[in-house]
Amino acid sequence: MATFLFKTVALLVLQSPQQDLWARVNADSTDGPAWLELGRAYLQRAADYHTHRKPVTVDTVWAHANLDTAQFAFERAARWSAGTRTADSARVYRVYAFGEWAYVDWEAAGSAAATLTWHSLPEGLRLPPVLEELGENLLRACPHRGILFTAGETDTQAAWYLRFSRGL
């Protein structure tokens, strides 16, 4: 299993359009902003999973590998840029990556799988208070058994985070 994961990650690195970001990270592994940009690039690649443009059945391994790489990059960005906007952004993107992971699992296996993914969120990983308040306001404004339409990904992720990981 470890060999398979290593080969998958190696394949992602070799085929990635983010080679310049990998070069920056290899030159200075403590470059927090480079890790953040790398994570954002992999998060975008994982979000492309939802387009389902391929005529064959889409495999979730590719999306999960991209999300794992994004999580790894965001963890590094937060670690090497402690106390900065880069670290704050990295923490928000880590929660966003969990939301994308839950979305992939929801498409593949239903709402129970998405809920389990949200429950695997580390306890110490939280959205900033302003985004938690946004999600709470959206959820409280929605009637019981109502349908919540959001204006964008920020609203959606904040609402999903509070609904599924915090149980609101």
Language model features: what each stretch is:
Residues M1-Q15:
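Hydrophobic alpha-helical targeting segments used for export or membrane insertion
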Residues N26-V58, A65, F72-R76, A87-A112:
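Amphipathic alpha-helical repeat scaffolds of TPR domains
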